[in-house]
């Protein structure tokens, strides 16, 4: 693992047009816009300090893993650095889903391409926000397509706690026939620090209802920590 950074390269990224806010929210409210702007500014300020904190924990605590294998063809974890790309390739990764905003992204799409990895970019604001149902569906289909080809997909956000968990849960719900509760417990048993914000839980439950309207899709949050 390395802590070197690299300028963002957005020219070759397959990117979602929306900003990751649920379409069910009210639109155009000045308070919501101010809140988003404030959280966005705070996220930029906190990005490198929190990234450094995670790196220190990774180096000092053996149980603090940068990524974890959730399913046969599915890895999820924290933001990768450039030197991680060859390691991911050796692990059989053929696709990467980035749920970070551009300022949080440390590996350009061109580098993934050089290692024959597809790169799906779904920019989603940190802390309080979730990908839309449309983007989650795109991500789930991407993971499933790679799995059918025997390729592993790496799903990541900044710390591998909230945004990436949202997508991974939805994949398990659709393609492994899990309930929301079962999917969450499965992921948490492998990566104990995962945590969903209420907006992320809501979109996972909505996705589950769309897959099976009669399915049970409620689970209890276990902590109020900041997520990413």
UniProtKB/Swiss-Prot annotation:
Keywords: Hydrolase, Lipid biosynthesis, Lipid metabolism, Phospholipid biosynthesis, Phospholipid metabolism, Protein phosphatase. It catalyses: O-phospho-L-seryl-[protein] + H2O = L-seryl-[protein] + phosphate; O-phospho-L-threonyl-[protein] + H2O = L-threonyl-[protein] + phosphate; O-phospho-L-tyrosyl-[protein] + H2O = L-tyrosyl-[protein] + phosphate; a 1,2-diacyl-sn-glycero-3-phospho-(1'-sn-glycero-3'-phosphate) + H2O = a 1,2-diacyl-sn-glycero-3-phospho-(1'-sn-glycerol) + phosphate. Pathway: Phospholipid metabolism; phosphatidylglycerol biosynthesis; phosphatidylglycerol from CDP-diacylglycerol: step 2/2. It holds the Pfam family DSPc. One of its GO terms (molecular function) is protein serine/threonine phosphatase activity. GO terms for biological process: phosphatidylglycerol biosynthetic process; root development. Residues 66-213 form the Tyrosine-protein phosphatase domain. Disruption phenotype: No visible phenotype in the double mutant ptpmt1-1 ptpmt2-1. But plants lacking PTPMT1, PTPMT2 and PGPP1 have strongly shorter roots associated with a defective order of columella cells in the root apices, with stronger effect than in the single mutant pgpp1-1. A motif (Glucan phosphatase signature motif CXAGXGR) lies at residues 157-163. The keyword Coiled coil does not apply. Its EC number is 3.1.3.27, 3.1.3.16, 3.1.3.48. Residues 1-10 have a biased composition (Acidic residues). Residues 1-30 are annotated as: Disordered. Substrate binds at residues 48, 126, 158-163. Exhibits phosphatidylglycerophosphate phosphatase activity. Involved in root growth and columella cells organization. May possess protein phosphatase activity. PANTHER family: PHOSPHATIDYLINOSITOL PHOSPHATASE, TYR_PHOSPHATASE_2 DOMAIN-CONTAINING PROTEIN. Belongs to the protein-tyrosine phosphatase family. Non-receptor class dual specificity subfamily. This is Phosphatidylglycerophosphate phosphatase PTPMT2.
């Amino acid at each position: 693992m390395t802590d070197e950074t690299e300028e963002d390269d957005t020219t070759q990224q397959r990117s979602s047009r929306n900003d990751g806010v649920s379409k069910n929210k009210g639109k155009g409210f000045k308070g919501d816009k101010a809140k988003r702007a404030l959280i966005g500014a705070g996220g930029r300020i906190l990005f490198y300090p929190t990234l450094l904190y995670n790196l220190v924990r990774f180096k000092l605590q053996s149980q603090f893993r940068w990524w974890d294998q959730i399913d046969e063809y599915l890895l999820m974890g924290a933001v990768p650095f450039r030197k991680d790309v060859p390691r991911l390739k050796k692990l059989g990764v053929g696709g990467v889903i980035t749920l970070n905003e551009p300022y949080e992204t440390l590996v350009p799409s061109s580098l993934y391409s050089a290692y024959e990895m597809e790169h799906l970019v779904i920019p989603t604001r940190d802390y309080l926000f979730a990908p839309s149902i449309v983007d989650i569906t795109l991500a789930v289909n991407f993971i499933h397509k790679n799995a059918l080809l025997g390729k592993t997909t790496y799903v990541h956000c900044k710390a591998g706690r909230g945004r990436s968990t949202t997508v991974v849960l939805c994949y398990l719900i659709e393609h492994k026939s899990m309930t929301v509760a079962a999917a969450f417990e499965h992921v948490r048993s492998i990566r104990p620090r995962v945590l969903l914000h209420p907006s992320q839980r809501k979109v996972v439950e909505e996705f589950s209802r769309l897959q099976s309207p009669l399915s049970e899709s409620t689970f209890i949050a276990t902590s109020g920590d900041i997520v990413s």
